[in-house]
UniProtKB/Swiss-Prot annotation:
SUPFAM superfamilies: YdgH-like
Extent of the signal sequence: 1-22
Gene3D superfamilies named among the record's database cross-references: Flavin-binding protein dodecin
Cysteine pairs bridged by disulfides in the record: none
Protein name according to UniProt: Uncharacterized protein YbiJ
Compartment annotation: Periplasm
Broad class of the protein's primary localization: periplasm
Domain of life: Bacteria
Organism: Escherichia coli (strain K12)
Gene Ontology BP annotations: DNA damage response; response to stress
Gene: ybiJ
Family as reported in the entry's similarity comment: Belongs to the BhsA/McbA family.
GO cellular component: periplasmic space
Keywords attached to this entry: Periplasm, Signal
Length: 86
């Protein structure tokens, strides 16, 4: 029983820690207080929400804590870019 409780606790804590590393959208005023660390791009999204999710995922993978979407275009599938910040 103790092993099960330990495993459940470890799973719960690991789930919570993933949220800490997620990149969040930032406003222009918030971005002024952050360091720009690059730009990410994504394509092939069918909705704006899906495009934002792809850009957020790439920003997090690059170690960013925030991102600001700078472009979105539609040519059958959506593509876009975002500046990433730390």
């Amino acid at each position: 029983m103790k092993t099960i409780n330990t495993v459940v606790a470890a799973m719960a804590l690991s789930t919570l820690s993933f949220g800490v590393f997620a990149a969040e959208p930032v406003t222009a005023s918030q971005a002024q207080n952050m360091n720009k660390i690059g730009v990410v791009s994504a394509d092939g999204a069918s909705t704006l929400d899906a495009l934002e999710a792809k850009l957020a995922e790439k920003a997090a993978a690059a170690g960013a804590s925030g991102y600001s979407i700078t472009s979105a275009t539609n040519n059958n599938k959506l593509s876009g870019t975002a500046v990433i910040y730390k």
